[in-house]
Amino acid sequence: MNKPVELIIFDWDGTLFDSVGQIVASLLFAAQQFAQPLTADAAKSIIGLGLPEVAQRLFPQVPELHTEILQCYAEHYVANSKGDVWFDGVADMLNGLREAGLQLAVATGKSRKGLDRVLAQKQSQTLF
């Protein structure tokens, strides 16, 4: 039995939004501030995870610094973000899917606060 599609769930970072560069830059900055080794490839490898798991994977040697490192990362990300950028064609595609009556959702490791901030910047709160 074939059922019509009613809901589409999208990944966020690196799928809908071109935010990978800013995430990596902010993680590298935070690591440097706390004298922790980190490569760009390692930073890229955790995109999509929640921040607690990011800290556990990237900085297992200093669990006592996880909170401070993540705070530094978040502050750098917000301060240096010029606004996340939809990949080409994504905004039109999402609007078309909504107009066709489909429900859209996001699965992300980004915090709800962070997701809401970006959606508000893009005036896209009603898409998801």
Feature locations, PLM:
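Active-site neighborhood of HAD-like aspartate-dependent phosphohydrolases
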Residues: 1-44, 59
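Short, acidic loop-to-helix structural element flanking the phosphoryl-transfer center
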Residues: 4, 79-106, 112-119
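Short alpha-helical
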Residues: 22, 50-53, 64, 92, ...
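Conserved H-loop
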Residues: 37, 125-128
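Short beta->alpha linker loops
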Residues: 46-50, 88-89, 110, 123
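A metal-dependent, Asp-based hydrolase signature
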Residues: 47-78, 96-98
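Short, hinge-like loop/turn segments at secondary-structure boundaries
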Residues: 58, 121-125
